[in-house]
C-alpha cells in the first residue's frame, strides 16, 4: 500500500472530488485500493504507531508577469487564468524569458496551501491526542527547518509558521 500526503503539485480538483473515507482513525481519499491520500490534520493509528499528517506547500517557482513586490503581497499574482484570451501569447513570452508559467486549475491550484480551517482542524486533532504522536508526515517543514535547509534564501509562509507551532507544541512518544 502506498500512503501519501499532498504537496503543491497535485491536481486538487480531482483529488478533492474523491469520496472521503475513514481509515485507521483518520480521513482519507482512496485513489485505488492500495493508493491512499492521508488528508490534512488527521491522526492515524498504524500498527500501534500514531501518525499526524499535514500536507500542502506553496509553489516557490511562480513569477509569471508579476513584479517581485506583487509576489510578496500575493504569491498567486504570477498565475495565468485559463480563460485569458492572451494566454498562449503570455506563455510564449514567459518561456522565452525563463519564467515559470502556471495556469490556475491546470498546473496550479489554490488548494496547495492549507486553509485556516484545515490548520485549526489539525490543532484540534493534536489537542485531542494530548499533543502526542509518534510521527508527523508533511510535505513542507517548520520555519526553523526552512531557515537551515534553505540557507536563508526562502521566506517562511503561513504553513511553515503553522508547522513550527506544531513542532514546538507536540511531543513524540
Stretches found by the model and what they are:
Residues 8-14, 43-44, 59-63, 142-147, ...:
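Active-site environment of divalent metal-dependent phosphoester hydrolases
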Residues 26, 49-154:
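Active-site-proximal loop/helix segment associated with metal-binding centers of metalloenzymes
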Residues 1-46, 156-157, 162-163, 168-169:
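Core catalytic region of metal-dependent phosphoesterases/phosphodiesterases
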Amino acid at each position: 500500500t502506498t500512503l501519501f500526503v499532498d504537496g503543491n503539485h497535485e491536481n486538487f480538483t480531482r483529488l478533492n472530488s474523491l469520496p472521503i473515507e475513514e481509515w485507521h482513525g483518520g480521513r482519507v481519499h482512496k485513489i485505488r485500493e492500495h493508493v491512499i491520500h492521508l488528508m490534512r490534520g488527521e491522526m492515524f493509528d498504524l500498527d500501534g504507531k500514531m501518525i499526524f499528517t499535514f500536507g500542502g506547500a506553496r509553489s516557490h517557482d511562480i513569477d509569471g508577469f508579476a513584479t517581485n513586490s506583487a509576489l510578496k503581497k500575493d504569491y498567486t499574482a504570477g498565475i495565468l487564468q485559463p480563460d485569458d484570451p492572451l494566454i498562449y501569447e503570455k506563455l510564449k513570452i514567459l518561456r522565452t524569458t525563463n519564467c515559470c508559467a502556471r495556469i490556475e486549475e491546470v498546473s496550479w491550484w489554490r488548494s496547495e496551501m492549507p486553509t485556516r480551517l484545515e490548520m485549526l482542524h489539525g490543532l484540534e486533532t493534536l489537542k485531542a491526542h494530548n499533543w502526542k504522536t509518534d510521527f508527523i508526515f508533511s510535505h513542507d517543514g517548520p520555519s526553523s527547518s526552512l531557515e537551515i535547509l534553505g540557507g536563508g534564501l526562502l521566506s517562511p509562509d503561513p504553513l511553515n509558521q503553522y508547522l513550527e507551532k506544531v513542532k514546538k507544541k507536540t511531543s513524540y512518544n
